[in-house]
Amino acid sequence: MHNASYWGPERANTSCPAPAPTLGCPNASGPAPPLPPPLAVAVPVVYAVICAVGLAGNSAVLFVLLRAPRRKTVTNLFILNLAVADELFTLVPPVNIADFLLRRWPFGELLCKLVVAVDQYNTFSSLYFLTVMSADRYLVVLATAESRRVAGRTYGAARAVSLAVWGVATLVVLPFAVFARLDEEQGRRQCVLVFPQPEALWWRASRLYTLVLGFAIPVSTICVLYTSLLCRLRAIRLDSHAKALDRAKKRVTVLVVAILAVCLLVWTPYHLSTVVALTTDLPQTPLVIAVSYFITSLSYANSCLNPFLYAFLDDSFRRSLRQLLACRTTS
């Protein structure tokens, strides 16, 4: 039920039911074209896999970070919050599957608003926490290269920053929950966003709202941080701390490649679909709908990739997980 699923202002309601595609709504105007059988099977299967993998991966992250006292660090606190956001999102795909198979919203309006809010939390909070983690890495790696400590970088400060991120995300997501409601479309009850008049203006504003606040600003910030860091590291003169500098360069290179590659891979097609939806009027062909569901599924997969990217690539995390599992087995 991504907000990027909205098709256009020509519809009575300016939103689509979940799980909605990104380039068009199957019920935007007139009867929805029949989905090809492979797509009708693939969509719920893919959503189920995303839910299962995301639930398992993020549960493992939470299990280790909450049960291992030595892992209570600033970085791990941000990873913990990221895992919480992704874990919450795993509640969305099962609801989307039910809506997809039944072709109508089978639940009440309260759950409609809740699912919309959780879905939007995934869109915004993940990149917001990645931005905070990037800023933290910027300070830490640069301080390491210069053989100094980051002033004020404490666990308590990280808690305050995390609460601030959740607060900002809540304010950003709140309008979607307000506009979410049940509505009859073509004789079917749907969970949609019903915008006031003029619908065309509100629809375009909602797309630009997500594009700017949910992608352009955080990704630009991440790029500026790592570009600046790489430039500053290259400018630092090698001295007796050359080994620390070399390690810092390696860490920042891995972080730049991992964060930016995954971020762009997952979110760029999703947000480019906003530009397409705003500038073109694509016919709702089976191909367009299939591409739309693929883009939506790719953005959903973000909740699966984060645990591997930010936790499972850490050797110490794997050791902690094995130790905790061994303790549970022997107890």
Swiss-Prot record:
Keyword Transmembrane helix: yes
One GO biological process term: neuropeptide signaling pathway
SUPFAM superfamilies assigned: Family A G protein-coupled receptor-like (SSF81321)
Disulfide bridge positions per record: 112-191
InterPro entries found in the cross-reference section: GPCR_Rhodpsn, GPCR_Rhodpsn_7TM, Neuropept_B/W_rcpt
Gene Ontology CC annotations of this record: neuron projection; plasma membrane
GO MF assignments: G protein-coupled receptor activity; neuropeptide binding; neuropeptide receptor activity
Membrane topology: Multi-pass membrane protein
Keyword Kinase carried by entry: no
Extracellular side: 1-43, 101-115, 181-205, 277-286
Main location: membrane
Cytoplasmic side: 67-75, 136-160, 228-251, 302-331
Compartments, record wording: Cell membrane
Keywords: Cell membrane, Disulfide bond, G-protein coupled receptor, Glycoprotein, Membrane, Receptor, Transducer, Transmembrane, Transmembrane helix
PROSITE patterns: G_PROTEIN_RECEP_F1_1 (PS00237), G_PROTEIN_RECEP_F1_2 (PS50262)
Glycosylated residues in this chain: 3, 13, 27
Chain segments annotated as transmembrane: 44-66, 76-100, 116-135, 161-180, 206-227, 252-276, 287-301
Family of this protein: Belongs to the G-protein coupled receptor 1 family.
Job description of the protein: Interacts specifically with a number of opioid ligands. Receptor for neuropeptides B and W, which may be involved in neuroendocrine system regulation, food intake and the organization of other signals.
Protein name: Neuropeptides B/W receptor type 1
Native species: Bos taurus
